[in-house]
């Protein structure tokens, strides 16, 4: 069962209405879910068969959904009110920025983008808008290289390969694409190599790469001291640093999750972005614009941070400074967060 809450002015919660929601609501989607990613006002997911579905704002083509025969198809392509199948192909990764999406094919080598990218984030050269999924070229991949993770910020994205190579495009003016590309680029570029890289996340003006050793390398991040705080913490806590197993990024805050289930956060904290629980049983953290949602070993869900649209489940719209437990009708096994949206996938009869 899929649940959603938060900002919904463009049908991005998949509830067949455009009203903001302050508590988890059941989404009319009956397939098992593997992955969820959220953009400014759109949402993508991969189902159990690795097929792509989307809902929300599609005016710039960011959902990848095209009406090829509008005279015979009454569905408006501008807004997808419920999750709609976009492609019958198989995909493995997906990520969304403000008004664009990037999806990785099941072969982990082919990449498609769609939507609008005024800062080059589509990776389609001078083409800044694509109404449907369009394959983009990553010319540097060798025969044995494949993508193992991908993430998008507001106007940039980065993928990392099994060889530790980083590729990406979009806005790199604040160092978020790394020191090699300190500019805006509209074609996928080689950004550098990080030994044993296994995951990447993107904020607005920074990106971060997690190595197998638990060490985290921050690209950009001067504003809000994301890089400085993270680097200092790692230098002073080498044993804890080696236990980091997952990372997550808000627009201006970086969170790290350890194998012991603890969360450490660096950067901006004006909207309770660091107000994480003291609990030590966290197994997943998902970061939205400026709020976070945590999943515990026991299948419960905690949430905190910015709450203007009810995305942190306070109906008074006040930010949540003490992580609160959501009341759910089942055991949570996936959490996701977007641009003022929150998502939980639950199993009702978990044993």
UniProtKB/Swiss-Prot annotation:
It comes from the Eukaryota. It is found in: Cytoplasm; Nucleus. The keyword Chaperone does not apply. Disulfide bonds: none annotated. GO terms for biological process: tRNA wobble uridine modification. Keywords: Cytoplasm, Nucleus, Repeat. This is RCC1 repeat-containing protein C10F6.04.
């Amino acid at each position: 069962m899929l649940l959603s809450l938060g900002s919904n002015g463009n049908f991005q919660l998949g509830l067949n209405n455009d009203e903001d929601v302050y508590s988890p609501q059941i989404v009319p989607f009956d397939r098992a879910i593997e992955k969820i990613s959220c953009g400014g006002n759109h949402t993508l997911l991969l189902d159990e068969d690795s097929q792509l579905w989307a809902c929300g704002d599609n005016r710039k083509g960011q959902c990848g959904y095209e009406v090829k025969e509008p005279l015979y198809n009454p569905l408006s392509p501008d807004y997808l009110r419920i999750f709609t199948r976009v492609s019958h192909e198989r995909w493995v990764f997906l990520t969304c920025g403000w008004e664009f999406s990037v999806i990785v094919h099941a072969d982990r080598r082919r990449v498609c983008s769609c939507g609008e990218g005024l800062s080059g984030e589509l990776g389609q050269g001078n083409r800044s808008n694509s109404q449907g999924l369009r394959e983009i070229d990553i010319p540097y991949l060798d025969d044995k290289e494949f993508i193992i993770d991908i993430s998008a910020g507001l106007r940039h994205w980065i993928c990392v390969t099994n060889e530790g190579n980083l590729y990406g495009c979009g806005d790199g003016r604040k160092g978020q694409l790394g020191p090699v590309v300190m500019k805006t680029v509209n074609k996928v570029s080689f950004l550098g190599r990080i030994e044993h890289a296994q995951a990447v996340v993107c904020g607005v003006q920074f990106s971060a790469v997690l190595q197998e050793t638990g060490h985290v390398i921050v690209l950009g991040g001067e504003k809000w001291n994301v890089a400085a705080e993270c680097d200092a913490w790692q230098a002073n806590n080498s044993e804890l640093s080696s236990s980091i197993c997952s990372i997550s990024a808000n627009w201006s805050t970086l969170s790290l999750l350890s194998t012991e289930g603890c969360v450490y956060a660096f950067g901006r904290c004006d909207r309770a972005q660091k107000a994480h629980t003291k609990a030590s049983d966290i197994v997943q953290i998902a970061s939205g614009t400026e709020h976070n949602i945590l999943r515990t070993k026991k299948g419960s869900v905690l949430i905190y941070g910015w709450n203007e649209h009810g995305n942190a489940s306070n109906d008074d719209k006040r930010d949540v400074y003490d992580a609160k437990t959501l009341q759910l009708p089942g055991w949570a096994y996936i959490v996701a967060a977007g641009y003022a949206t929150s998502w939980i996938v639950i199993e009702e009869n978990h044993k």
